[in-house]
């Protein structure tokens, strides 16, 4: 790649705190030059006319900012792994409303005050900290023993003031333990020593375990090199992460050693798992090294580079952290904004118990259930599971998709079961509470129920209405659910009213380029979407999430595709997406894999798309690209 201006390597971290500022040494013009050369997205024209650093950096993402010399030293301390600092004891990230707590550190003031991951600090000492930025973060550090009063908005919308005592917090970011033949790696962040902890922990204990659980809940990230080293213990050699810069050039970060275990990893994840945690979790899925359970991760799929006096003549003790790359996990998918979708969606109150149930051994003396997930075998001792954690067992069975591969083992033999049969054998209802009452006769019932298990589609009163057409607004809602991406921004379209039920979905999809208007600044949200419109939108989604799709489109311009007879009835703007969905991926026999819900020959491009067709096509696309890994 052209730009290699690293000091610490690519950083994927939510830095914890920083301290008071000093005089600015960097001019707006110099900062603009840095951003022009390395910021991952094209800056708007208005950025050229910025009058201050604050105004200039408002045109970038939350992870791009300027640091004075004092702030830079605090930042360096915060990413070194096992560190000591005087602060409230929380890993944070910036959001428009203020400062979001990604995780609380053990022994810190935030933990003692009862703060939790997902809480948003909206004011510090009664002063608003919206939008979140380094200048607000500085107020959270101070001398040990002093206190700071913060106003916090909780996930349920309530807010309260907390007086938090700053303290020196020493955090060892990774611990490895073995209990009952199960290895448990608890990793709070990816620091300079994390890769070593993983490598030594797995190497030293693998002979004593039959399963590995890796707990990344609340892990806000850290160093990509540490995530790659940790992942390599399970995956072995290969390219484990890809960075793509503003020019579309990509480079891989590889692991060259052998894997240290043949046991699959069970990765625990939640909404506080971000950045390097997502590299690890996505890499486990992409390399077939295990599964991910819990809830969807945070969605920080961008990497930063650090400019300081060692690599930039504009800087003298101060620094600029710049989002310079989007990263793609080992399977070729980005986690940018969409996060990692778990193999099994398990409520957090059952996640650890579910992981331990999945860590069982094949038994001779009692009945067991063997699950084949992402190419790996997992055994559940049924009598022990029902006795120790019936709720977790039920949660696992509720999270499985209709096509799950299941075997019942008993008296030395095995037989294959359907999901409904497995539920009944375990003493639960054959159907899940997530199942729809009106899709049994749909040819796409399996795809619809699979999306429901992954919390991507939701019905109305237990019904899905498979034969109904979809409006443009409804399609945006479906895609927003799939990507877990919504936007409070407004102004993309004059006919998408702020406060309308579909505005967050439409605006989010417009912001990432999945949908566009109909002309005159309008979106026409209530118009029915056609097959070719949905093909176009779905193709853009695949391009957004998958690196291989981007490369395919670069090699297949419209000028080559438009003359093909098979696209005679298509509008020109739908052709590249149609080709991407039907002729870009090939199976082991060399046959094209169709990501859409029907063949090109069966498509009538201008007729409305049905809800069942949209769900099936979305499912096929997410499965083919590896966003969904079962």
Label each region the model flagged.
Residues 62-103, 163:
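PDZ/PDZ-like peptide-tail recognition elements
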Residues 2-25:
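Sec-dependent N-terminal signal peptides of Gram-positive bacterial secreted proteins and lipoproteins
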Residues 120-151, 199, 226, 301-311, ...:
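PDZ domains, with a preference for the canonical peptide-binding region formed by the helix
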Residues 177, 182-213, 217-433:
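C-terminal "post-core" interaction segments
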Residues 4-5, 409-445, 458-473, 480-505, ...:
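Feature responds to low-complexity, polar/acidic, surface-exposed segments characteristic
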Residues 26, 83-131, 192:
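PDZ/PDZ-like domain segments forming the peptide/carboxylate-binding groove
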Residues 100, 135-176, 323-324:
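PDZ-domain C-terminal substructure recognizer with occasional recognition of PDZ-binding tails
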Residues 27-80, 149-151, 155:
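Interdomain regulatory linker/hinge segments that flank or connect interaction modules
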């Amino acid at each position: 790649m052209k730009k290699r201006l690293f000091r610490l390597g690519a950083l994927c971290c939510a830095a914890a705190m920083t301290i008071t500022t000093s005089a600015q040494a960097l001019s707006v013009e110099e900062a603009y030059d840095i951003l022009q050369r390395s910021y991952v997205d094209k800056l708007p024209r208005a950025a050229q006319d910025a009058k201050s650093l604050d105004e200039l950096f408002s045109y970038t993402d939350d992870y791009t900012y300027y640091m004075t010399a004092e702030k830079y030293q605090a930042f360096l301390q915060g990413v070194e792994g096992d560190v000591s600092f005087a602060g409230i004891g929380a890993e944070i990230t910036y959001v428009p409303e203020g400062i979001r707590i990604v995780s609380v550190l053990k022994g810190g003031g935030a933990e003692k005050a009862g703060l939790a991951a997902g809480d948003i600090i909206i004011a510090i000492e009664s002063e608003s900290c919206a939008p979140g930025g380094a200048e607000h973060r500085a107020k959270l550090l101070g001398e040990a023993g002093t206190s700071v009063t913060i106003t916090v908005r909780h996930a349920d919308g309530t807010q309260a003031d907390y007086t938090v005592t700053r303290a020196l917090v020493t955090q060892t970011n990774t611990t490895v333990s073995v209990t009952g033949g199960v290895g448990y790696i608890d990793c709070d962040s990816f620091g300079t020593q994390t890769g070593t902890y993983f490598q030594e922990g797995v190497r030293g204990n693998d002979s004593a375990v039959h399963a590995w659980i890796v707990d990344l809940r609340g892990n806000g990230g850290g160093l990509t090199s540490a995530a790659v080293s940790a992942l390599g213990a399970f995956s072995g050699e290969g390219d484990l992460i890809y960075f793509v810069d503003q020019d579309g050039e990509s480079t891989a970060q590889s692991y060259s050693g052998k894997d240290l275990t043949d046991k699959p990893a069970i990765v625990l994840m939640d909404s506080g798992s971000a950045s390097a945690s997502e590299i690890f979790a996505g890499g486990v899925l992409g390399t077939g090294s295990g599964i991910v359970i819990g809830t969807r991760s945070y969605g920080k799929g961008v990497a930063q580079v650090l400019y300081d006096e060692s690599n930039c003549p504009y800087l003298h003790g101060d620094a600029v952290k710049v989002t310079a790359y989007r990263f793609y996990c080992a399977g070729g998918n980005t986690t940018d904004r969409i996060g990692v979708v778990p193999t099994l969606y398990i409520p957090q109150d059952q996640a650890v118990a579910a992981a331990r149930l999945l860590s069982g051994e094949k038994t001779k003396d009692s009945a067991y259930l063997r699950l084949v997930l992402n190419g790996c075998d997992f055994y559940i001792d049924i009598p022990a599971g029902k006795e120790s954690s019936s709720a977790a067992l039920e949660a696992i069975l509720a999270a499985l998709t209709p096509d799950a591969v299941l075997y019942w083992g008993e008296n030395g033999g095995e037989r294959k079961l359907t999901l409904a049969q497995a539920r009944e054998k375990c003493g639960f209802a054959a159907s899940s509470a997530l199942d729809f009452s009106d899709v049994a006769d749909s040819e796409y019932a399996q795809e619809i129920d699979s999306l429901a298990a992954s919390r991507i589609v939701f019905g109305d009163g237990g019904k899905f209405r498979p034969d109904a057409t979809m409006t443009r607004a409804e399609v945006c809602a479906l895609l927003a659910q799939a990507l877990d991406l919504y936007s409070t921004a407004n102004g993309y379209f004059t006919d998408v009213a702020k406060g309308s039920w579909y505005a967050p979905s439409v605006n989010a999809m417009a912001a990432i380029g999945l949908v566009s208007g109909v002309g005159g600044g309008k979106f026409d949200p209530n118009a029915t979407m056609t097959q070719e419109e949905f093909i176009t939108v779905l193709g853009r989604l695949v391009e957004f999430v998958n690196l291989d799709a981007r490369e395919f489109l670069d090699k297949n311009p419209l000028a080559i595709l438009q003359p093909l007879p098979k696209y005679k009835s298509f509008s020109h703007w739908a052709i590249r997406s149609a080709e991407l969905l039907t002729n870009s991926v090939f199976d082991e026999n060399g046959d094209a894999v169709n990501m859409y819900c029907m063949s090109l020959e069966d498509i009538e491009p201008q007729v409305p798309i049905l809800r069942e067709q949209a769900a099936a096509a979305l499912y096929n696309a997410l499965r083919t690209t590896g966003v969904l890994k079962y």
